């Protein structure tokens, strides 16, 4: 793709957002502001509300209470500017790679699809079937499918969780480089704290349906694996997660 930015990043504002499932409170009056173009990672224990937050932003769920805004506009009104990637690339096996990238598009989209594939290093695989691709290559196709829509907001729900270590690092670098080039806003949900710290400007820890930790990652890019500062920030987040886990264990024993 060319070096022009695809779109201006979407600014996000969540005001007192709650999400309940019957008696289960997953998000509890959560307040959050994400400036346009920021890369944010969300971590936390399973069941803490990370994926629910992503689903609200993707328009797959509606909040029980509160407002989800893109600046001053309800995010639901500009949902076409939002794209989401999952751990499973969700490619249609009966369609070629390029047809998966252009899925749902009308008109003359093939040139744009080829540019999107070139941006993720798969320009020579356009005519192949998904079955011929590795797991990492399938995720590159999913990323190209997101890029062709010129997103203002890219939501990543553990998209690298099933990849081997080396492929995962390559995909991390690719996502960060495309974000730097095009300026969209990114929200990454991950269980991997080292991944969160390595990729994001900011790491959020969700606890009891609210933001329990909001950590700025003030490390210049490109970031070097093995950096002492990266290790310190990772340890800070992990310590907070573990403290919370120990508190919950004590409460269960007392109960």
Curated annotation (Swiss-Prot):
GO terms for molecular function: ABC-type alkanesulfonate transporter transporter activity; ATP binding; ATP hydrolysis activity. GO terms for cellular component: ATP-binding cassette (ABC) transporter complex, substrate-binding subunit-containing; membrane. Residues 12-233 form the ABC transporter domain. One of its GO terms (biological process) is cellular response to sulfur starvation. It is found in: Cell inner membrane. Keywords: ATP-binding, Cell inner membrane, Cell membrane, Membrane, Nucleotide-binding, Translocase, Transport. Pfam families: ABC_tran. It comes from the Bacteria. It is a peripheral membrane protein. Transmembrane segments: none annotated. Part of the ABC transporter complex SsuABC involved in aliphatic sulfonates import. Responsible for energy coupling to the transport system. The complex is composed of two ATP-binding proteins (SsuB), two transmembrane proteins (SsuC) and a solute-binding protein (SsuA). This is Aliphatic sulfonates import ATP-binding protein SsuB.
